[in-house]
Amino acid sequence: MKIYIENYKQIQKPGENNKSAIHRLQPLMLKTALADFPFFSGSNGFPVLQERTPAGKPYLPSHPAFHYNFSDSGDYLVLAVSPKHEIGVDLQKLTPVRAGVISMAERFFHPEDLALLRNAKDAEEQLKLFFRIWTIKEAYLKCTGEGLSGGLNRCPVCLAASQIGGLPFLEMAPPKTGYVLTVCESFPISSPPL
C-alpha cells in the first residue's frame, strides 16, 4: 500500500473551480503512482485507461489486480494504491456539522458508533470522533466497492481492534492539522499484507 497526497490548490488555475482542478490532478497522480510499481515500468508515459464498476469504483482494465482509490477534502487530494488488495481511502477536513454530530450519527451510524459519540468528554472530542468514524466507514465502503450506498450504519467501527466489517483500517497522519485520513485494505485480519 502506498499513499500520495497533493495540495490541489497549488496547481489550480485562476478562475478554475475545485472539482476541475481535482479532475485534472487525478490522472497525473495516478501516473506517478503507477511509475512506482515495477510491473508498470517501461510504459513510457502510458495512457491511463480507467473504467468503473457498476457501483462507480475506478479500476484499470489492463491491470485488474492493481487497486486504487481517491478522496478529496479541503485543499487536498489523496490517492491510495495497492498492487494486491482492494483499497479505500477517505480524507475529511474537520468542519462543524450543521445538523449536529449526534443528529447526523443517529441518521447514518450504527448504534454502537452512536454510543461512542455520546460518551465523548466534550463537543471538540465528539466532533473529532465523528469524523474518525465517518472516514473509517467511508474508506471501508469504498474498499468493498459499495460506496456510500452500502450504508454507513451497516456495521460498527471497532476502534480498539482497528477493524470494520472484518477488514482492517489504518488511521494515517493527515496532510495537515484539522484533517482525518483513513485507509481500509481488503486483506483479512488474520493475514496481514506482505
Each predicted region: which residue ranges?
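Core catalytic alpha/beta fold that binds nucleotide/phospho-ligands
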Residues: 1-194
